[in-house]
């Protein structure tokens, strides 16, 4: 069995994960010393799973009768040793259609380490194959939501590390079957509370089933109170009884933030998509939609792709860490994990230019030093994710002297954005149209159609899905869609090998970033450093003053790296930024409808009195990625892909709210301003 806690909604978020406290029996069975309970039956853990959870949720029959391309969602309270998941994987692979996907969600407050999982699985030869697959992708011990995929994405595992009631409200899925695991109600009363059953009801439908090892009266009464029909059955082994059943009601649940509710259902049968913009944001979402079976046309106003910040020789890939593990940290951790999931296969196949050579984040000020050290200790960053280096250790890793301490991220690195754009746009289902500046986006003038009409000076295009990824400089289009995008100029400096006293072994961030690498046969340069922030300057011309500033910042961090050079080279680009430094991602709301539904209403009503957000069908945006685009565009692509096809959410609800395209207008209204 496994543990999950149920704190109140308003309890302060404590990011540091608690470790599982385990004792091992002579037979190799793990026991929680905190709860004085075993993780699974000493008699036969796999037989226990099959009997309680698979049989009493009728999973063999349900998997076998699924239609092609189906989705099936299981939500489990308490991942524990993972035996429930592994046994379910075997059944799924045996019984389900080859193109169906299992989404297995599990919440765990005290996650086991990879080595502890391996030890727990060692006695079960039957699950060795899915165990190895899980251990290969098992996420880092960091709080919150983690997605991993097994068996060519036939199985998606979403792990929530932390309190159950911090996790369950973050989900907006339709659960087909519940695995109510967790240590016994007597020993873990915090989990078995009425709010657990309320959340179960919120995420269930009339076909949803549940099963649990316990038949405690409080559990049965709690489930029945929230609409579940409960039956008892003989328990497994020494347990006298268990219970199982189904959700017997269909009741509406009011949203706590109706203005941020996700667009539901997607397009009924999306076939064609138009993506406006061929930078990183546009190319990645085009690739995602093409991979989902859509025919995609990409419209680019320039003569070539990736002409703004996406055209830099190299960009750093690394997470953002903060001591309070705030929403930006959570978003960019999720984005970092997603970026690596996309990039690793391309690195391995040499399809893109870049290197996962680690990244040293140097603490250039006392404030930065304190922030990074607090993040390391308060969040409890695992060493496989990040570890602290003094100046000597940092110098050794970088390969150049530095006088600064820093935080090293071994999984981070750099990539050439243009190579990613080229790789994405090479998909056979994508057609690229250059020198096509979009002048208007309008619904097709046919009441029976939900298609969009896109006008350029040269052509008219039509599609059922449109994604606007135009970046910083298309002010008219951004204004038309109520996107508060502000362009911020940035200049990077390029250096040839003769301009350097030595190479950098890792990517380095300081007050800017510096990268050494092979940028491709067409590039004469060996290093890049930058980038300046020069708002509100919109001149595309390279500046000597900006080069001097880039050199100064690099030398401040790495005093012996750059040689004296008067050969100034580089690139100017414009970052699309937002007021809160998070991107704008998702379905574009119907702002005219919002005026009546929200802005002309008092902001003080109870939330249930407001209608759920209404969107412009088939219209999406991925913009405002700023200086951290390499950690957000891939996640944005997956978010939009899931919205278009009606697939499950790809990150917590709170993060959807944080990047919602209408968030600034909503915040203004909710503040009482007019």
Curated annotation (Swiss-Prot):
<dbReference type="InterPro" id="IPR017610">
    <property type="entry name" value="tRNA_S-uridine_synth_MnmC_C"/>
</dbReference>
<keyword id="KW-0285">Flavoprotein</keyword>
<comment type="similarity">
    <text>In the C-terminal section; belongs to the DAO family.</text>
</comment>
<feature type="region of interest" description="FAD-dependent cmnm(5)s(2)U34 oxidoreductase">
    <location>
        <begin position="276"/>
        <end position="674"/>
    </location>
</feature>
<dbReference type="InterPro" id="IPR023032">
    <property type="entry name" value="tRNA_MAMT_biosynth_bifunc_MnmC"/>
</dbReference>
<keyword id="KW-0963">Cytoplasm</keyword>
<dbReference type="GO" id="GO:0002097">
    <property type="term" value="P:tRNA wobble base modification"/>
</dbReference>
<keyword id="KW-0819">tRNA processing</keyword>
<dbReference type="GO" id="GO:0004808">
    <property type="term" value="F:tRNA (5-methylaminomethyl-2-thiouridylate)(34)-methyltransferase activity"/>
</dbReference>
<dbReference type="InterPro" id="IPR036188">
    <property type="entry name" value="FAD/NAD-bd_sf"/>
</dbReference>
<keyword id="KW-0560">Oxidoreductase</keyword>
<dbReference type="GO" id="GO:0016645">
    <property type="term" value="F:oxidoreductase activity, acting on the CH-NH group of donors"/>
</dbReference>
<dbReference type="GO" id="GO:0050660">
    <property type="term" value="F:flavin adenine dinucleotide binding"/>
</dbReference>
<protein>
    <recommendedName>
        <fullName>tRNA 5-methylaminomethyl-2-thiouridine biosynthesis bifunctional protein MnmC</fullName>
        <ecNumber>2.1.1.61</ecNumber>
        <ecNumber>1.5.-.-</ecNumber>
    </recommendedName>
</protein>
<keyword id="KW-0489">Methyltransferase</keyword>
<dbReference type="GO" id="GO:0032259">
    <property type="term" value="P:methylation"/>
</dbReference>
<comment type="similarity">
    <text>In the N-terminal section; belongs to the methyltransferase superfamily. tRNA (mnm(5)s(2)U34)-methyltransferase family.</text>
</comment>
<dbReference type="Pfam" id="PF01266">
    <property type="entry name" value="DAO"/>
</dbReference>
<dbReference type="InterPro" id="IPR008471">
    <property type="entry name" value="MnmC-like_methylTransf"/>
</dbReference>
<keyword id="KW-0511">Multifunctional enzyme</keyword>
<dbReference type="InterPro" id="IPR006076">
    <property type="entry name" value="FAD-dep_OxRdtase"/>
</dbReference>
<dbReference type="Pfam" id="PF05430">
    <property type="entry name" value="Methyltransf_30"/>
</dbReference>
<dbReference type="InterPro" id="IPR047785">
    <property type="entry name" value="tRNA_MNMC2"/>
</dbReference>
<keyword id="KW-0949">S-adenosyl-L-methionine</keyword>
<feature type="region of interest" description="tRNA (mnm(5)s(2)U34)-methyltransferase">
    <location>
        <begin position="1"/>
        <end position="248"/>
    </location>
</feature>
<keyword id="KW-0808">Transferase</keyword>
<keyword id="KW-0274">FAD</keyword>
<comment type="function">
    <text>Catalyzes the last two steps in the biosynthesis of 5-methylaminomethyl-2-thiouridine (mnm(5)s(2)U) at the wobble position (U34) in tRNA. Catalyzes the FAD-dependent demodification of cmnm(5)s(2)U34 to nm(5)s(2)U34, followed by the transfer of a methyl group from S-adenosyl-L-methionine to nm(5)s(2)U34, to form mnm(5)s(2)U34.</text>
</comment>
<dbReference type="GO" id="GO:0005737">
    <property type="term" value="C:cytoplasm"/>
</dbReference>
<dbReference type="InterPro" id="IPR029063">
    <property type="entry name" value="SAM-dependent_MTases_sf"/>
</dbReference>
């Amino acid at each position: 069995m496994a543990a999950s806690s149920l704190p109140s909604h308003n309890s302060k978020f404590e990011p540091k994960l608690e470790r599982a406290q385990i004792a091992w029996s002579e037979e190799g069975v793990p026991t929680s010393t905190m709860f004085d309970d075993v993780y699974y039956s000493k008699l036969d853990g796999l037989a226990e799973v099959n009997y309680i959870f698979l049989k009493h949720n009728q999973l063999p029959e349900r998997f076998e009768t699924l239609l092609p391309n189906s989705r099936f969602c299981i939500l489990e309270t308490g991942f524990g040793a993972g035996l429930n998941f592994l046994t379910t994987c075997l059944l799924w692979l045996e019984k389900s259609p080859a193109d169906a996907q299992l989404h297995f969600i599990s919440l765990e407050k005290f996650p086991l380490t990879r080595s502890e999982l391996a030890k727990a699985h060692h006695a079960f030869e039957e699950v060795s194959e899915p165990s190895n697959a899980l251990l290969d992708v098992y996420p880092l011990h960091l709080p919150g939501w983690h997605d991993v995929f097994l068996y060519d994405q036939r199985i998606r595992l979403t792990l929530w590390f932390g309190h159950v009631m911090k996790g369950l409200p973050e989900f907006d899925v339709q659960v087909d079957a519940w695995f109510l695991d967790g240590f016994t109600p007597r020993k873990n009363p915090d989990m078995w509370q009425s709010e657990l059953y309320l959340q179960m009801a919120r995420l269930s439908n009339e076909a949803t089933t549940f099963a649990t090892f316990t038949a405690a009266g409080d559990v049965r009464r709690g489930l029945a109170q929230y609409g579940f029909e409960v039956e008892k059955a003989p328990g497994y082994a020494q347990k006298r009884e268990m219970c199982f059943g189904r959700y017997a009601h269909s009741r509406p649940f009011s949203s706590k933030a109706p203005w941020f509710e996700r667009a539901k259902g997607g397009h009924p049968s999306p076939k064609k998509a138009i993506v406006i913009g061929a930078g990183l944001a546009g190319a990645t979402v085009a690739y995602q939609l093409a991979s989902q079976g859509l025919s995609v046309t990409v419209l680019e106003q320039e003569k070539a792709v990736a002409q703004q910040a996406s055209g830099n020789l190299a960009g750093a890939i690394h997470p953002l860490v903060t001591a309070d593990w705030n929403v930006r940290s959570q978003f960019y951790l999720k984005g970092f994990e997603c970026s690596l999931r996309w990039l690793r296969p391309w690195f391995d196949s040499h399809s893109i230019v870049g290197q996962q050579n680690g990244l040293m984040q140097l603490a250039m000020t006392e404030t930065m030093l304190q922030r990074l050290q607090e993040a390391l200790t308060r969040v409890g960053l695992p060493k496989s994710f990040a570890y602290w280096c003094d100046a000597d250790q940092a110098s050794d890793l970088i390969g150049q002297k530095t006088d600064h301490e820093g935080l090293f991220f071994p999984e981070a690195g750099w990539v050439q954005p243009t190579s990613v754009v080229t790789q994405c746009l090479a998909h056979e289902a994508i057609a690229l149209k250059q020198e096509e500046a979009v002048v208007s986006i309008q619904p097709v003038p046919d009441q029976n159609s939900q298609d969009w009409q896109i006008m350029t000076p040269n052509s008219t295009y039509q599609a059922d899905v449109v994604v606007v990824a135009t970046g910083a400089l298309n002010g008219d289009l951004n204004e038309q869609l109520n996107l508060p995008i502000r362009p911020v100029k940035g200049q990077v400096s390029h250096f040839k090998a003769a301009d350097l006293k030595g190479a950098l072994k890792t990517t380095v961030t300081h007050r800017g970033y510096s990268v050494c690498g092979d940028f491709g046969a067409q590039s004469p340069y060996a290093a890049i450093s930058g980038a300046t922030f020069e708002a509100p300057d919109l001149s595309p011309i390279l500046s000597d003053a900006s080069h001097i500033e880039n050199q100064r910042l690099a030398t401040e961090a790495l005093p012996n790296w750059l040689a004296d050079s008067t050969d100034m080279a580089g690139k100017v680009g414009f970052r699309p930024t937002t007021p809160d430094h998070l991107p704008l991602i998702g379905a574009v709301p119907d702002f005219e409808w919002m005026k009546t539904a929200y802005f002309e209403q008092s902001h003080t009503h109870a939330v249930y009195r407001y209608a759920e957000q209404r969107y412009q069908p088939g219209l999406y945006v991925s913009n405002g990625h700023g200086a951290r685009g390499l950690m957000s565009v891939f996640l944005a692509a997956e978010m939009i892909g899931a919205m278009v096809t009606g697939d499950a959410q790809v990150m917590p609800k709170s993060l959807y709210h944080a990047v919602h395209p209408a968030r600034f207008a909503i915040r203004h209204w909710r503040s009482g301003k007019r």
